[in-house]
Amino acid sequence: MSNPPQGSSLASPIQAAAVTGDKTTLLRLIASSPQVIDQEDQLGRTPLMYSVLGDRRSCAEALLKHGAKVNRPDRSGRTALHLAAQTGNHRLLKLLLSRKADCTHRDLCDITALHLSTRHQDTQCLVLLLKYTPPGQVDAQDQRKQTALHWSAYYNRPQHVRLLVRHGSNIGIPDTEGKIPLHWAAGHKDPEAALTVRCLFEAAPTESLLNWQDYEGRTPLHLAVGDGNQEVVRLLTSYRGCNVAPYDNLFRTPLHWAALLGHTPIAHLLLERNNSPNIPSDSQGATPLHYAAQGNCPDTVRVLLSHPSVRDEADLEGRTALMWAAGKGSDEVVRTMLELNPKLEVNRTDKYGGTALHAASLSGQITTVRILLENRAQADAVDVMKHTPLFRACEMGHREVIATLIKGGAKVHLVDKDGRSPLHWAALGGNANVCQILIENNINPDAQDYEGRTPLQCAAYGGYIGCMEVLMENKADPNIQDKNGRTALHWSCNNGYLDAVKLLLGYNAFPNQMENTEERYTPLDYALLGGHQEVIQFMLEHGALSIAAIQDIAAFKIQAVYKGHKVRRAFQERKNLLMKHEQLRKGAAAKKREGENRQKVKVGQTKGKQKDADSMERQNKSNEQIIKNEVVHEWQGEASGNAEDRKGKHREENLETNHLQHSKHMAKNQRITAQIQSSPSEHEHTNSIQIRTSPSGTSNTQSSPLGNEIPKNMYWDDNPSQKHTQTRRTSRHQMESPDVVVHRIEDLIQKESRRKSHREERKGSHRQRQSSDYRLHTSEKEASDSAIHREEEGKKKETKKGRRTVAVTPKIEACCKGGCGKLSQSEKVSLGIGIQGRVDCITSPEPCETPSRVCRERKTISAKTGQRPLTETHKPPGKACRSSSALKSSLPSHIKQTAIDSKCLDSTLSYIGFGEAIKPLFPMGILREGSFFSKWQNIDIELIPVQARLQLVEREKARKQLFQRKNHAATVIQKAWRTYWVRKSSCKTRHSRSQNNPPAMV
């Protein structure tokens, strides 16, 4: 037969037989199976333990007789002896002790059978155990460091205490709380506990035991007062060495405990036994009166106030007992205190300026508020925060208190030190009914504090839908911004209150309001930062934008507006420039008219002299015809020698006469020119370009403006008669063939006729080019770019006259088209026009620009070479000068097509210094009246300030380039800024997602 398991159920046959006392069955089971004698159940108990629990002595004896283990413990570590002592069965206890049961065995809590024996009123078990307990094991301690004496004092067993003390138990052993057996005896509520206290104190009557303090500083008197055991208190205080007012760790005395718990007789007893004139206060500065007032113990308060040493003093926070009573709603105590002391200061303030009415309003004690208002309490008393009792009531939502305070004269329009009204505090507390009461009392629903926050923003911060709805129903504006630019929608989105967001948008809250901080966040940005997905989705559905999107839209609009502004500004500047040019043109025209008037006066003075010039021209024509006829007849041999001599003499006389007249005429013109130059009034208003000729008495060579040396005989000498004589001698001894002369004369006449017809054609083409000249006049940039382009083309063009070469540089060509006013003085000198002025009639095949634009004024430039200046005597005819036929072969190909004109020839040769030198090469008939060689005349022409216009154009160009760079830089910065914030937002979003959804373990 196999053995039964050790952990069988409680209903095993042998255990059932043991607990029921069925000895027959028990013996039969033991006989059939001896192994079941110590069989354990689920609790580890054996049949012997069950026989003890069932008080079955016969079964226990049978089990012990058949070899049951007497000291075998159960699962809690207790043996059959523990169970016998716990039940108080001294017969079984004696049986077990006789079978050598261990009385010092401890269970899992270190409890012995001696500890358990103190639970019963009968002392027989304790006596048996003390008889078998060794002397040193009487004070065996359990896990709480308590001995059998502690247990006896706790269960109020005075006889057990005497037995244990008689067997040498120590009454001064503290347990884990620092309490000795006297603490446990004094803390019993039974009045008979005084006997146990007396037994313990008589065992060792010392002051140290009487005033022993546990680890919290409490003495047996504290515990006796705490349990309200008046007999024990009277007994303890009756001993001479007892301290009536000991302090615990919180500096509270037994009187504090009595006042707090409302033990009026004990408080009266302690006041009688207290020999100190002062009532001590605890660590908070509170006296027993404070605790009695807080506990609503009017009798105790009356007892305390009747003692002469008790006064209503303030605690460390400055609060009196009346404030404590008002805060707890101790109406009876308040009435008692006001009754005992009619002059009590009801409006006395604490450390923070609060009164008893503040405390009652904060806790919502409506009855106390009414009592205080009836006893002269100020309804609008303010504390250090400038809060009245109404503020406290609104914050906590006490509607009845608010109505009572308003009825008692409290003002609803006051604000605290932060500028907040009671409505702000009601909204912060989420009290919708209080908000309605305050609005009904004419308080502004849009009142702003010193930070600009409204009650609606306070309610939105907490997500209080009821308050928000009440405020907006009463016309509260949801779009009001605080000092940082935040609205109620910002706070709702920041905290993720979807219902509040829906409510605000339903009342037309602006979803894209930006704050005033550096970040300029919108409500959507706050929702994104908080990761509130539902709020984000709802805001996007209602047109919300982030600050990045708003900046993109604003940048696009700003650029469009700025471009329009730039166009308007450029148009206005161009308009101003044209108006300025028009003013300059009108001024130049006025100066021109003034010069013409002066010229008319001069022409009237020279009319008589003009007649001499006309007669001289007619004489030249006749002389030319005579020379032609003479040459023809001489080579044909038809005339005789005498006739030839007579004709030669006659011709010489005529030529000499003509040259003398011409010399006189030139001298007169030079004197007139000198007079004009010496006139200071005319010199101030006229700037004319003076053409230099070769002075008499200079060296054999003369430097031309182009840098080449020209022989002296190339200039027209100051002595025309001598020059004419030399020419006559040359023509007499070196006479060309008549065919050559006639051919040359006819060629010149044909060219003259072609020049006239070509001039008419050029006039028509010139009218067509006037529009392009006007565009050139309005666009200086094109002229400057053209000059730079010609400069880069850079190959010098050379012209030849005889064996001399004239170089035409790109700067000369630019000067010909743009005017010499665009060149500096050094450039003019280097180009050969520093003295003469312009060479555009030589280098350019195109007609010169209009006199009003280019040739309005010619300046007098003093030559540094020492040559005598002469006055220019012509105006380029027809606005387009042509090059002469004499230089046609040596000029570039694009100049060779130009027809000859005598006036243009004179002016051209005068510019380059060849006028007088090549005059004898042309017949006198070709050089008509008004040419350089026959007429001297001064003409005043006003120049347009080209350099000033160039400076304006360059300045405009630089300004446009600077703006383009700034615009490009601004675009780059905006793009970088948007990229940065997009990256930052995406990083935050990924970070939040990674925190919310951590990666799964692989």
Curated annotation (Swiss-Prot):
Domain of life: Eukaryota
UniProt short sequence motif D-box 2, positions renumbered to this chain: 959-967
One term of GO molecular function: calmodulin binding
Biased composition annotated in UniProt, kind: Basic and acidic residues: 586-599, 609-621, 643-656, 733-763, 770-796
Description of its domains: The D-box (destruction box) mediate the interaction with APC proteins, and may act as a recognition signal for degradation via the ubiquitin-proteasome pathway.
Job of this protein: Required for normal renal development and establishment of left-right axis. Probably acts as a molecular switch between different Wnt signaling pathways. Inhibits the canonical Wnt pathway by targeting cytoplasmic disheveled for degradation by the ubiquitin-proteasome. This suggests that it is required in renal development to oppose the repression of terminal differentiation of tubular epithelial cells by Wnt signaling. Plays a central role in convergent extension movements in gastrulating embryos, a processus regulated by Wnt signaling.
Protein name, as recorded: Inversin-B
Organism the protein comes from: Xenopus laevis (African clawed frog)
The gene coding this protein: invs-b
